[in-house]
C-alpha cells in the first residue's frame, strides 16, 4: 500500500525555535504535515527495479535542492580483493543554493597493486558566471512576454501530478495519522531513515 512507502511528520521544538503547532495562525491540534519522504517506482522497461527516494520538509538541517544518483554495483568487480573498501559511484546534481555537478568515482592508486581511492570530478559556477546568469523567474517573465510556454507547466502535467498526490493523500485518510515528529534543524525523523534502510540504502547527507 502507498502509506507503507511514505513518512509524514511535524517538526517540534529545538532550542529557541518554536514547534510548528505553536506558530502563529496554526491550530494546537494541527495535523498538517511539515515533512514527507517516500519511495517511488516507475513501472516500465526503462526504470523497472530502480527506486526513487524523495524527501522534503520545513526547518530541516539545510535549505538545499539536490539530486543524488547512485550507480549499481557490477556483479563482478575487477578489484574484487578490495571491493569492501570501494565507495559508491555517485552523480550529484546541486540545484540550490549552489549550482553544480560532481561525479564521485573510485580510481586505481598510482602505485603497484590494485588498491583504489575515491576521486571527485566537480563543476561549479564561478562567481562571475553567477553574476552574469539571470534568475529563474527572469527567464519565465521574458518567456511570458514572448508568448513562449515551453518552460511552463502544461495542464495535463499538472493534472497527472495531482492525481498522483491525491492517491497518496486518500491512503493516509484511511489510516489513523501517526506523527512521530522530528527536531527542527535535523534531516527528519527516524522513520524516514528506516524507509531506505529496509532496502539496504541510506540518505546521502552532507555530500556535494
Task: Report the location of each language-model feature.
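Single conserved hydrophobic/aromatic residue that forms the stacking wall/gate
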Residues: 1-7, 11
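Conserved nucleotide-binding/hydrolysis modules and their immediate coupling elements
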Residues: 78
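Histidine- and/or cysteine-centered catalytic micro-motif in compact active-site loops
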Residues: 43-45, 55-59, 70-74, 96, ...
